[in-house]
Design a protein with these regions (language model features):
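N-terminal carbohydrate-binding accessory modules
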Residues: 29, 45, 202-212, 295-363, ...
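Short glycine/proline/serine/threonine-rich loop/turn segments at secondary-structure transition edges
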Residues: 118-122, 161-166, 232-236, 266-268, ...
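Beta-strand-rich binding/interaction modules
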Residues: 138, 218-261, 269
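Extended carbohydrate-recognition surfaces in non-catalytic/accessory domains of CAZymes
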Residues: 26-126, 181-189
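Bacterial Sec-dependent N-terminal signal peptides
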Residues: 1-28
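Substrate-binding/catalytic cleft of secreted carbohydrate-active enzymes
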Residues: 360, 370-504
Length: 504
């Protein structure tokens, strides 16, 4: 792409952002897409500040973007042919596990001029995923990043942005070495990036709502609220919170406004809001995936709206027992589907909602009703579409409990305590999710010191998971054997411990 063409599209994307920001300024919570107009540089740079000088020869891309799918194919040489004497042997190429594509590094750069009305606000950069590991820079300084590309994160830039100036956002995406995964992962900013603007003192933090339905009519909502209003000095201060339940046509079917007691010592805490009842609720199922929306509004000390968040949900019950298996709304349902990776074939790993929707609709036409997210969390768009189309999901977190399968930059032991809360809080309100899977083929590996075939590691993770969702059961996908069933079978300790037994 020539320089003038690249610059035209780059600044067109920037103008679209500023226009969107201006139109959204009246909202109490602005969520602005930053998906259009990123400079992309293939390869590493010694200094992040060099990127601006390289833009004349770089591409301008829109997100989601997978830079690995565009790499050349690398065929295995004669020494890398499979061992035909072993039916389970793969091609021994150094790249076979990642789709015969060269691993590498890609840099993304974006120019942002903050609007004047954002001053005094809380401003977040929200990344829904950077594959495989990523680092985020603002005006040349590292401000955040991820060691697990299948989950998102946000960075508070309220005090870092320079108003009245062009700010440079840069993102480094690193695929690491080929052994960091056993399939084609894609690379780069393969999911959406947003800018979120809220009130700075009273707001909902990340993934703040936990919505449960009881007896197919009662709706319970637990809300995480952050309050640092200066007038809050002692217990007995109340925060007005309003909840409205909207049906699929946008009509209010239940609502309630209540005051929650706030202690100044607890700036960040969860509140169990009073339950609401939906008369003659329409149930969510594979055949009738009916969705309601919970709208929760916060009011400040002066009675003005401080923040508002909307979350779709479905009214349904799920149960698993040895007698009947899975019951949805009291009816037995067989999981008929497949385990699949997050990529989209020739399109690569970029999470295009339209492509995901097409695949799910084809599944429904074939009579399928289920997807296992092998072996990592899919995009939020995927789950929204499963909710809308009536596809049941076994939501899986990891492949192996090993460093190289967890991302390659840090050990798995350093990941799970922050990954599980992000994963569960992100996905727990989706009616399509019926079972949590903590991972794939997990019995025991040398980096785990417990020597009990994965039981202690599972119990620790299960305990943390149920802190954030006690409405669903947990499982792991166990590997029943190695090469020879007669001599290499694995002890069944983990099968006894898991809430639901699952085998590959």
């Amino acid at each position: 792409m020539k320089y003038m063409t690249a610059k035209y599209f780059f600044y067109s994307g920037l103008l679209m952002l500023l226009s969107a920001a201006g139109n959204a300024s009246a909202s109490v919570r602005d969520t602005i897409s930053l998906d259009r107009g990123w400079q992309f540089h293939r390869g590493d740079v010694s200094d992040v500040n060099m990127l601006k000088n390289l833009q004349a020869n770089d591409e301008v891309v829109n997100l989601p973007h997978d830079f690995l799918i565009g790499q050349d194919w690398v065929a295995p040489d004669a020494s890398e042919r499979p061992d035909n004497s072993d039916a389970g042997s793969n091609v021994r190429s150094r790249l076979s596990s990642r789709g015969f594509k060269e691993m590498g590094i890609g840099w993304y750069r974006y120019e942002l001029t903050p609007k004047a009305e954002w001053k005094g606000k809380r401003i977040l950069l929200d990344f829904q995923g950077i594959m495989l590991v990523g680092d985020v820079y603002l005006n040349g300084k590292r401000i955040g990043g991820t060691d697990y590309g299948y989950l998102g994160f946000d960075v508070d830039v309220s005090k870092l942005l320079k108003f009245g100036e062009v700010n440079e956002i840069a993102v480094k995406a690193d695929t690491r070495n080929p052994n960091n995964s056993r399939w084609f992962t894609g690379a780069g900013l393969y999911r959406d990036v947003n800018l979120i603007v809220t009130d700075k003192d009273l707001f909902f933090p990340r993934h703040p709502l936990f919505i449960r339905t009881v007896n197919n009519q009662e709706v319970k909502i637990r809300a995480n609220i952050f309050n640092q209003q200066k007038k809050v000095k002692a217990p007995g201060t109340f925060i007005p919170v309003e909840v409205r339940i909207l049906d699929a046509e946008g009509h209010v079917v239940a609502q309630q406004k209540t005051d929650v007691d706030f202690n100044a010592k607890w700036r960040d805490r969860e509140y169990e809001l009073p339950a609401l009842k939906i008369e003659n609720a329409k149930l969510w199922s594979c055949d009738t995936p009916y969705l309601y929306t919970a709208e929760v509004t916060l009011y400040d000390n002066e009675g003005k709206v401080a923040d508002q968040i909307r979350e779709p949900f479905g009214v349904r019950t799920i149960e698993m027992n040895p007698q009947h298996g899975l019951l949805v709304n009291g009816k037995k349902v067989l999981l008929q589907g497949f385990a699949n990776h997050h990529t989209l074939g020739a399109l690569g790993a970029a999470a295009y909602p339209r492509a995901i929707e097409k695949r799910l609709k084809m599944m429904k036409e074939f009579g399928f009703n289920h997807v296992r997210t092998s072996h990592n969390p899919y995009s939020e768009d995927f789950l929204r579409l499963c909710d809308r189309l009536g596809i049941l999901v076994v939501d899986e977190l990891y492949d192996k409990w090993l460093a190289q399968y967890a991302g390659g930059r840090v050990d798995w032991e350093s990941l799970w305590q922050k990954d599980i809360p992000e994963w569960v809080k992100r996905d727990r309100n989706h009616p399509s999710v019926v079972l949590w899977s903590l991972g794939n083929e997990l019995q025991q590996y040398s980096n785990l010191p417990f020597n009990d075939w994965g039981v202690t590691a599972y119990e620790l993770q299960k305990q943390l998971l149920h802190r954030y969702d006690d409405t669903r059961l947990t499982t792991v996908a166990m590997h029943p054997r190695y090469r020879n069933l007669d001599t290499d079978s694995i002890p069944a300790d983990l099968a006894v411990a898991t809430e639901v037994n699952s085998y590959n």
